[in-house]
């Protein structure tokens, strides 16, 4: 088919039709255009035929030899009127998807529309002007019909709103994004047993199904059907009713765990800081305490008894053995030396004479030598022959 001319040519063709009608002389033939219906419906994606034909009064219905029709089809949308097909002087021009049902010349002017879309809805006008074999116009007629393109429901989407647990309330929603006319919804449960729902739990306009006080027996596969005059589409959702704790209990357990972990981390951090605080004073340098003074010890010459009588030799009560006399060769500890083995001296007895001083220096070593060796002199008290201290 030849593509349609522009709007300017369309207007010129319309003026041509009007001119032919005005110049037509009076004639016994009267042209009548017939459209059997004022409205037609079709489905999007399909095709439709807009029926139209004309007759001449007092003549047969079929075209006569030399009869020349001029045909134009127009479509008017919300903004402007467009020419979709024309047949003039044996030449047909049309838009894609638009054609005449019968070959021309013919008195049947039916128009076929293919690949319909919703935007093709609107009024269509057919205009016809006929000339006889002598080139004289036999008449002119124009009529309009309305086309309504219906759209079947697009596949809906099913959703579950709420937490499906025992005793809770949930809502099943179903929504189709596109349809003409508007769809209505129906919810059914298919498995494990069939069940149909009605108002008030079912909203056929919004497509919502309210389920209250859930129980385990209400679980199953729920199917939503969206339907209108020209089609049906459906979706489904599986409802599983749980008996576990609710969302609030789970959330509380999670929050409690997080708080416990936070407190534990705080205690560990506090313990770590206190450990550092105790280590720092231990590493500080402190001044040592003053050493005690050393008492002077008497010289070794002062260890001899003033009366010249030495009954026993001892260092101090702390240096004596706790029980019994010291054994020969016992260790005698001193404040500044480790221990030395000193023999226990024996007091010689004389008849009525005063005893002579006995040197306590063993081995014949002098007191000055012992001092150089580190020995410490010890004050020994004198005793009388009766055993009392002098």
From Swiss-Prot:
Ranges facing Extracellular side: 30-248
Keyword field contains Transferase: no
Protein name, entry field: Endothelial cell-selective adhesion molecule
Gene3D superfamilies: Immunoglobulins
SS bonds (residue pairs): 174-224
Main location: other
Complexes and interactors: Interacts with MAGI1.
Domain Ig-like V-type: 30-143
Cytoplasmic side: 270-390
Naturally occurring in which organism (per UniProt): Macaca fascicularis
Entry's Gene Ontology cellular component terms: adherens junction; bicellular tight junction; plasma membrane
């Amino acid at each position: 088919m030849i593509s349609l001319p522009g709007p300017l040519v369309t207007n010129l063709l319309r003026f041509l039709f009007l001119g032919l009608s005005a110049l037509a002389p009076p004639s016994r033939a009267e042209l009548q255009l017939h459209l059997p219906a004022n409205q037609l419906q079709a489905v999007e994606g399909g095709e439709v035929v807009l029926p139209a034909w004309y007759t001449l009064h007092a003549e047969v219905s079929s075209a006569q030899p030399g009869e020349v029709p001029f045909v134009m089809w127009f479509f008017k949308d919300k903004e402007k009127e467009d020419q979709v097909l024309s047949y003039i002087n044996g030449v047909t021009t049309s838009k894609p998807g638009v054609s005449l049902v019968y070959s021309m010349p013919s008195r049947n002017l039916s128009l076929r529309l293919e690949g319909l879309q919703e935007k093709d809805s609107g009024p269509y006008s057919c205009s016809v002007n006929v000339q006889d074999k002598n080139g004289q116009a036999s008449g002119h007629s124009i009529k309009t019909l309305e086309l309504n393109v219906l759209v079947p429901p697009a596949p809906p989407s099913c959703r579950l709103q709420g937490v499906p647990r025992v005793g809770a309330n949930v809502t099943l929603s179903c929504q189709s994004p596109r349809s003409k006319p508007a769809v209505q919804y129906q919810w059914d449960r298919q498995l494990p047993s069939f069940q149909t729902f009605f108002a008030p739990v079912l909203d056929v306009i919004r497509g919502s199904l309210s389920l209250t006080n859930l129980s385990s027996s209400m679980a199953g596969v729920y199917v939503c059907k969206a339907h209108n005059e020209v089609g049906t589409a459906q979706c489904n959702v599986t409802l599983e009713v749980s008996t576990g704790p609710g969302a609030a209990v789970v959330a509380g357990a999670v929050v409690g765990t997080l708080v416990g972990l936070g407190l534990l981390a705080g205690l560990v951090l506090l313990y770590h800081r206190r450990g550092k605080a105790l280590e720092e004073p231990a590493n500080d340098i402190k001044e040592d305490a003053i050493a005690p003074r050393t008492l002077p010890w008497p010289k070794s010459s002062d260890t001899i008894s003033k009366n010249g009588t030495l009954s026993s030799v001892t260092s101090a009560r702390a240096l004596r053995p706790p029980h019994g006399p010291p054994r020969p060769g016992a260790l005698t500890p001193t404040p500044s030396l480790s221990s030395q083995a000193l023999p226990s001296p024996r007091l010689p007895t004389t008849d009525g004479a005063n005893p002579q001083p006995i040197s306590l220096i063993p081995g014949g070593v002098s007191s000055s030598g012992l001092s150089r060796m580190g020995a410490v002199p010890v004050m020994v008290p004198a005793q009388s022959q009766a055993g009392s201290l002098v």
